[in-house]
Amino acid sequence: MVVGRGLLGRRSLAALGAACARRGLGPALLGVFCHTDLRKNLTVDEGTMKVEVLPALTDNYMYLVIDDETKEAAIVDPVQPQKVVDAARKHGVKLTTVLTTHHHWDHAGGNEKLVKLESGLKVYGGDDRIGALTHKITHLSTLQVGSLNVKCLATPCHTSGHICYFVSKPGGSEPPAVFTGDTLFVAGCGKFYEGTADEMCKALLEVLGRLPPDTRVYCGHEYTINNLKFARHVEPGNAAIREKLAWAKEKYSIGEPTVPSTLAEEFTYNPFMRVREKTVQQHAGETDPVTTMRAVRREKDQFKMPRD
């Protein structure tokens, strides 16, 4: 992995991050004070598929997905188009494809400008509300980015047309990746704006949860610390949560992303992936996954974040 440089030195950024953390301020607030330039890029090189993690706005992520064999690339949720164009040029790749997870402005709001900057782009998404859409997709639709396979997974709940993108290299030994937008976060999930607890259960446990355990999870926002604080509240005896939280605080303090996680990891510390576990059900006062999902999401929406 290669980490890009920010505008502050490591010590200065660490001090600022630690100060924010002591006051209970999350990564989004660091973004407000410092802007996106102080959140570092990250290049994840697993083989043929490379993923450039591009911080955007205050806590969003865009992802440049590169096929190293053909030098063709796709961009996931390009809310800051010029930054996308610059990243593609830096890597010397041809941007051909836009993968939009959902229609919210902080994910799809850059589509119209990007198609003006880069002609001939194919814009994929599962919702007619997505700007500049050229290819509407449904559950299990497939497409290619160079030699990479992309499978579209419908995960309605956060929005009714939400799509996650599962990317793999046929015949390759490298782990696959899934770009989850606002359905699955590190240690969390998206709010149920246009769906139900039953739909989120299906999305997390039946659609995403059945992907290979080593699948890299690239989510839409940097919410990891606060998500883990809530997870700790739900399962105070869970050592995996404590360890991941300490790790995430260190990453945050130096401006580095906490993505990707893996699906296997999510099943150890994400309360929304653990709604079948007795410890989570007992905390919620429920006995089945759907009612537990509903109760835990309701509690998370009202949770007062501790300042540690």
From Swiss-Prot:
Q: Which positions bind Zn(2+) 1?
A: 102, 104, 158, 182
List, separated by semicolons, the cofactors it needs.
Answer: Zn(2+)
Which organism was this protein described from? Homo sapiens
The record's EC number reads 3.1.2.6
Where in the sequence is N6-acetyllysine found? 116, 229
- Subunit comment: Monomer.
Q: Which gene encodes it?
A: HAGH
This protein's transit peptide sits at 1-13
The protein, known as: Hydroxyacylglutathione hydrolase, mitochondrial
- Cofactor binding note: Binds 2 Zn(2+) ions per subunit.
Q: Which domain of life is it from?
A: Eukaryota
Q: Which GO terms describe its molecular function?
A: hydroxyacylglutathione hydrolase activity; metal ion binding
Q: Which SUPFAM superfamilies match?
A: Metallo-hydrolase/oxidoreductase
One GO BP annotation is: glutathione biosynthetic process
Query: According to the UniProt entry, which residues carry N6-succinyllysine?
Result: 229
**Broad class of enzyme this protein falls into:** hydrolase
Going by the UniProt record, its keywords in alphabetical order are: Acetylation, Cytoplasm, Hydrolase, Metal-binding, Mitochondrion, Transit peptide, Zinc
Which SMART domains has this protein been placed in?
Answer: Lactamase_B (SM00849)
Q: In which pathway does it act?
A: Secondary metabolite metabolism; methylglyoxal degradation; (R)-lactate from methylglyoxal: step 2/2
Reactions the enzyme catalyzes: an S-(2-hydroxyacyl)glutathione + H2O = a 2-hydroxy carboxylate + glutathione + H(+); (R)-S-lactoylglutathione + H2O = (R)-lactate + glutathione + H(+)
Q: Name one Pfam family in it.
A: Lactamase_B
Q: In which tissues is it expressed?
A: Expressed in liver and kidney.
Q: What does the UniProt record say this protein does?
A: Thiolesterase that catalyzes the hydrolysis of S-D-lactoyl-glutathione to form glutathione and D-lactic acid.
- Which InterPro entries does the UniProt record give? Clx_II_MBL (IPR035680), HAGH_C (IPR032282), Hydroxyacylglutathione_Hdrlase (IPR017782), Metallo-B-lactamas (IPR001279), RibonucZ/Hydroxyglut_hydro (IPR036866)
Q: Which family does it belong to?
A: Belongs to the metallo-beta-lactamase superfamily. Glyoxalase II family.
The UniProt record gives the binding positions of Zn(2+) 2 as 106-107, 182, 221
List the GO cellular component terms: cytoplasm; cytosol; mitochondrial matrix; mitochondrion
Annotated residues for binding of substrate? 191-193, 221-223, 297-300
Lineage of source species: Eukaryota, Metazoa, Chordata, Craniata, Vertebrata
